Amino acid sequence: VIGGDECDINEHPFL
């Protein structure tokens, strides 16, 4: 899952 702040920063550190 690639979202951003919504996603878990630990799992998906994408902004």
Curated annotation (Swiss-Prot):
EC number: 3.4.21.-
Gene Ontology terms describing biological process: proteolysis
Regulation: Inhibited PMSF, benzamidine, leupeptin, and Cu(2+).
Boundaries of every Peptidase S1 domain copy: 1-15
Keyword Cytoplasm part of the UniProt annotation: no
Leading EC class: hydrolase
Compartment annotation: Secreted
UniProt keyword annotation of Transmembrane present: no
Keywords carried by this UniProt record: Blood coagulation cascade activating toxin, Disulfide bond, Glycoprotein, Hemostasis impairing toxin, Hydrolase, Protease, Secreted, Serine protease, Sialic acid, Toxin
Tissue specificity statement from the Swiss-Prot or TrEMBL entry: Expressed by the venom gland.
Gene Ontology CC entries for this record: extracellular region
Subunit structure: Monomer.
Purpose: Thrombin-like enzyme that has high clotting activity upon bovine and human plasma. Also has fibrinogenoltic activity by rapidly hydrolyzing Aalpha chain of fibrinogen (FGA), and partially consumes Bbeta chain (FGB). When administered intraperitoneally in mice, causes defibrinogenation, making the plasma incoagulable.
More about this protein: Negative results: does not act on the gamma chain of fibrinogen. Does not act upon factor Xa (F10) and plasmin substrates. Does not induce hemorrhage, myotoxicity or edema.
Protein's recorded name: Thrombin-like enzyme BpSP-1
Species the sequence originates in: Bothrops pauloensis
